[in-house]
UniProtKB/Swiss-Prot annotation:
GO terms for biological process: DNA recombination; DNA repair. It comes from the Bacteria. PANTHER family: RECOMBINATION PROTEIN RECR. Keywords: DNA damage, DNA recombination, DNA repair, Metal-binding, Zinc, Zinc-finger. It comes from Bacillus pumilus (strain SAFR-032). A zinc finger (C4-type) spans 57-72. Residues 80-175 form the Toprim domain. This is Recombination protein RecR. The gene is recR. CDD domains: TOPRIM_recR (cd01025). InterPro entries: DNA_Rcmb_RecR, Rcmb_RecR, Rcmb_RecR_Znf, TOPRIM_dom, TOPRIM_RecR. Disulfide bonds: none annotated. Belongs to the RecR family.
Amino acid sequence: MQYPEPISKLIDSFMKLPGIGPKTAVRLAFFVLSMQEDVVLDFAKALVNAKRNLTYCSVCGHITDQDPCYICEDTRRDQSVICVVQDPKDVIAMEKMKEYNGLYHVLHGAISPMDGIGPEDIKIPDLLKRLQDDQVTEVILATNPNIEGEATAMYISRLLKPSGIKLSRIAHGLPVGGDLEYADEVTLSKALEGRREM
């Protein structure tokens, strides 16, 4: 079907989002067209504002509007424990359960040789620099329970074993192949509680 150019561009823009195929993009485009103009403008401003004003924390890699982020700046948090996650959304999922009080390190990915992603392509070197601080006594590996997440956890575990830092892996209360961001607070809490030493 041939659409007027503005609709075609809107559909193409929606299709750039993950999980949005042609049919969903058409539905979203027509939904946006049916919205009040002020609501559409607010939505557009929110997108631009987020893109312009958010950055990654220079310490942990979490998404933030200040640097360092509010988690790294919080002196009430346990500075001796770092929880390593793959993505900023994983930090948000962990924070929702309100049981973990340490710091984080966001890798921004996982080792995936099939996709050409090696240890140097994610934030493992930054993690190693952070761990030179004698204050850190435990690292919790909370990468996703899929092949890439497990490979990443094993790689980090082998790197850190000689350091004497306590290493643990969150328990598999999480479904294999699942992502942290989709887990509910109870499941995440149990997984953190049942973490195992590596």
